[in-house]
Curated annotation (Swiss-Prot):
General function of this protein: DNA-binding transcriptional activator. Recognizes and binds to the consensus octamer binding site 5'-ATAATTAA-3' in promoter of target genes. Plays a fundamental role in the gene regulatory network essential for retinal ganglion cell (RGC) differentiation. May be involved in subtype specialization of primary motoneurons. May bind to insulin gene enhancer sequences. Essential for heart development.
Biased composition (Polar residues): 321-343
InterPro entries: HD, Homeobox_CS, Homeodomain-like_sf, ISL1/2-like, ISL1/2-like_LIM1, Znf_LIM
GO molecular function, a single term: DNA-binding transcription factor activity, RNA polymerase II-specific
Gene: isl1
The protein's name: Insulin gene enhancer protein isl-1
Keyword Transcription on entry: yes
Amino acid sequence: MGDMGDPPKKKRLISLCVGCGNQIHDQYILRVSPDLEWHAACLKCAECNQYLDESCTCFVRDGKTYCKRDYIRLYGIKCAKCNIGFSKNDFVMRARSKVYHIECFRCVACSRQLIPGDEFALREDGLFCRADHDVVERATMGAGDPLSPLHPARPLQMAAEPISARQPALRPHVHKQPEKTTRVRTVLNEKQLHTLRTCYNANPRPDALMKEQLVEMTGLSPRVIRVWFQNKRCKDKKRSILMKQLQQQQPNDKTNIQGMTGTPMVATSPERHDGGLQANQVEVQSYQPPWKVLSDFALQSDIDQPAFQQLVNFSEGGPGSNSTGSEVASMSSQLPDTPNSMVASPIEA
């Protein structure tokens, strides 16, 4: 046995012609509802032998096929008086189960045409207006007391408005069913849905060859596949129309919360905030007096002390600078002779 999850493969049945009973090997097969198959040369009217194809209407009754003209002539509804059929543009009058032309809807006794609102009686021998119906009823009951109440054997009816002969109520019911059948809902599994959706994404309107391949792949009937694609296209169309309407309403959409009206906004990615201050960059430099620079240089270099002292005095010289030079001289006298005499001391934390 195969895998229970796989759909059963559809067996290709042999097509037999209903007309001649032989197998059909032709390229094209004529199918008549519900499941009758014919050769193109065997499907013809049983009365006039006219060939029937997809360009004309075919009727089946008691195993025989008829063209539209002969079927209406043989089995169509006819006027109860003139026994002539109705055209699609005719208006008719109804009396119980019988149908009449408007011109034929007359009293058989006085030939008066009955119009909507007139009372009439339908008897075995035809239509009677109320006056003639009373006369016939009295004559049938015999000569009795004229003051005795009249008990009509058949109740009177009132003529209604004429109706069109094209209404479905006047059409012959060939395949009449006593009760309305309930259509079984088809449930698709995940594999079938995946196959159908993949094909739909590639082509929402597959041709006949693609549909036949889907029938073989999914195990579904052609009708189920056709209806699924129709429903899918309808849903997508409704969804696209709804999205367009939402996009058109979005610019004019307003949000009102507790009396405050605002426009909806969409949050974007965060950006760096510069503060918005317009200022020029200022470069800060440290300043040291000249004697400080020279003192540091003397500590790190082995130079002649008198020449260095003269250089310090020269850099600090000038009018009003005697006090500064004496301070530098006294400070330099306290410095060690050479950098080699410096003793390293530990750095306190």
